[in-house]
């Protein structure tokens, strides 16, 4: 029986452990199962619960905490921290809204992190071992590995299966930097154990995790340097979005070192080589936000005739591995490493493995959102990807400052752009930069998933005044370009003068 620890050992972390890896838990003796799922994160839990709900005999294994990275070390604690940081930032903007604090906000970082741990323990209750067992799935805690093409072993217990799903997720990538030693840096798995605010924080990376936490710690009072070997922030998103976030970061006092490489660590100093040469950054804490790598080690995949590489478990479009009875889903096999994508692939795996379906993972419409302020949400094609795939597109765009609710809220920084297949209303992609982009983008995910054309968005009544009106206003741009199709619902007159007039379609 394995054990697990979290620091600090307060009531919240003890509760998280009790829920996700109960001390004294005794595994069953093994047996035969319709489905064995390796990994108790979001992917594995959805796969196991879906199969159990369908009446199948299911086992699920987990070496650490049920709930996996997302609820324990990723999405849940990071968003709790970001919310605290946004509250501090909003308080500092009081003069914009007609109030003034007699003294600057005093940040109690220990209380901030206590709230993060409390939120985590509350959220993880839904993924607790007992909760999983109540769905009918049988939980085995410990290290799982294949011993044959149809057998998984967990701490000496033999689990024979008809089908299996590998859902072991991913681990933080640690770059090869001279002098970087384990225990001397933070990742997403250790940063939420902090109890004291680092006065000086260096963040390596330019993707979602690095950007989100760099901004959050800056707002909470740390001096922050962000180092990225890319020329822009969030390089997988549209360049304009990354540039907007760069400007916001610099306005908030983050020091950015883009196009720079971290080359050496020595006693609280990081040597960085960039366009202007090599310089040293002093820090009290060093956070790695350099991406993730699939967790394929120690599974003995060879014993099950499952092919894999450093990129993860190799699967076909149905998420089936080289062993036709074994599937893989989530971060360990799917390029889009997001919790929502992981859960979608889990459902697809179960449908294909146990119900005889042939659903393709390539059919999934997978969005993503980076929870900076403003947030950056994207779905489908960008212009660069459209060119790579040979898809001709039309572009319809609106600045958020021209949406009345956005400037009323003081959240006008951002924009929305929708791409359609050239000459049609078929939506093939969209980017939204807005304070609440993650909440708003689902309208376009729905339209793309169900192939709803842009003219239907134009016809759909949206509540006024809301920031989500940005999509209808863009859709009305499109409708106005259709020859002989001036819509009877009309293009609403702009309010506030030129500030919120629609921009012409490109």
Give the ranges of each region predicted by the language model.
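Beta1/beta-strand and adjacent pyrophosphate-binding region of the FAD-binding site
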Residues: 26-43, 197-207
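Rossmann-like NAD(P)H-binding beta-loop-alpha module
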Residues: 195-237, 338
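FAD-site-proximal beta/loop scaffold in flavoenzymes
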Residues: 181-198, 280-355, 458
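Glycine-rich flavin
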Residues: 2-33, 50-56, 61-197, 230-234, ...
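A Rossmann-like FAD-binding core segment of flavoenzymes
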Residues: 101-102, 138-141, 145-153, 159, ...
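Flexible, glycine-rich terminal cap/loop adjacent to redox cofactors
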Residues: 7-10, 38-43, 47-64, 76, ...
């Amino acid at each position: 029986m394995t054990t697990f620890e979290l620091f600090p050992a307060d009531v919240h972390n003890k509760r998280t452990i009790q829920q996700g890896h109960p001390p004294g838990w005794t595994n069953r003796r093994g047996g035969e199962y319709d489905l064995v799922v390796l990994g108790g994160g979001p992917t594995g839990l959805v796969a196991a619960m879906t199969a159990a709900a369908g009446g199948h005999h299911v086992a699920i294994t987990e070496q650490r905490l049920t709930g996996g990275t997302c609820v324990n070390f990723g999405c849940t604690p990071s968003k709790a921290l970001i919310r605290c940081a946004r509250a501090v930032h909003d308080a500092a903007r009081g003069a914009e809204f007609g109030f003034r604090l007699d003294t600057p906000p005093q940040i109690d970082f220990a209380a901030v992190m206590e709230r993060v741990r409390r939120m985590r323990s509350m959220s993880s209750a839904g993924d607790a071992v007992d909760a999983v067992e109540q769905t009918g799935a049988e939980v085995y805690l410990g290290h799982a590995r294949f011993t044959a093409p149809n057998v998984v072993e967990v701490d000496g217990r033999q689990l024979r299966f008809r089908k299996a799903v590998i859902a072991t997720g991913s681990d933080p990538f640690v770059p090869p930097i001279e002098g970087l030693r384990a225990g001397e840096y933070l990742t997403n798995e250790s940063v939420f154990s902090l109890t004291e605010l680092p006065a000086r924080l260096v963040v390596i990376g330019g993707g979602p995790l690095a950007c989100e936490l760099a901004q959050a710690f800056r707002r909470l009072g740390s001096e922050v340097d962000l180092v990225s070997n890319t020329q822009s922030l969030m390089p997988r998103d549209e360049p304009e979005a990354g540039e907007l976030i760069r400007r916001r970061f610099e306005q908030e006092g983050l020091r950015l070192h883009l196009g720079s490489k971290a080359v050496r660590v020595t006693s609280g100093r990081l040597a960085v080589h960039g366009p202007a040469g090599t310089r040293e950054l002093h820090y009290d804490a060093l956070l790695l936000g350099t991406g993730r790598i699939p967790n394929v080690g120690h599974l003995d995949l060879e014993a099950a005739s499952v092919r894999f590489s450093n990129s993860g478990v190799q699967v076909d479009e149905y998420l089936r591995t080289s062993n036709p009875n074994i599937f893989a889903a989530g971060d360990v096999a799917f390029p889009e490493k997001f919790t929502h994508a992981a859960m979608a692939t889990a459902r697809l795996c179960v449908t294909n493995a146990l119900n005889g379906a042939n659903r393709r993972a390539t059919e999934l419409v997978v969005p993503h959102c980076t929870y900076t302020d403003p947030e950056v949400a994207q779905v489908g094609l960008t212009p660069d990807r459209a060119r790579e795939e040979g898809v001709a597109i039309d572009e319809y765009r609106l600045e958020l400052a021209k949406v009345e609710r956005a400037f009323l809220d003081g959240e006008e920084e951002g924009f929305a752009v929708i791409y359609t297949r050239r000459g049609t209303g078929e939506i093939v992609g969209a980017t939204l930069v807005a304070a609440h982009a993650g909440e708003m983008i689902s309208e376009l995910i729905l339209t793309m998933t169900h192939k709803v054309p842009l003219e239907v968005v134009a016809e759909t009544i949206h509540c006024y005044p809301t920031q989500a009106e940005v999509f209808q206003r863009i859709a009305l741009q499109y409708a106005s370009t259709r020859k002989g199709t001036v819509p009877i619902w009309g293009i609403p007159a702009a309010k506030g003068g030129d500030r919120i007039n629609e921009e012409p379609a490109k």
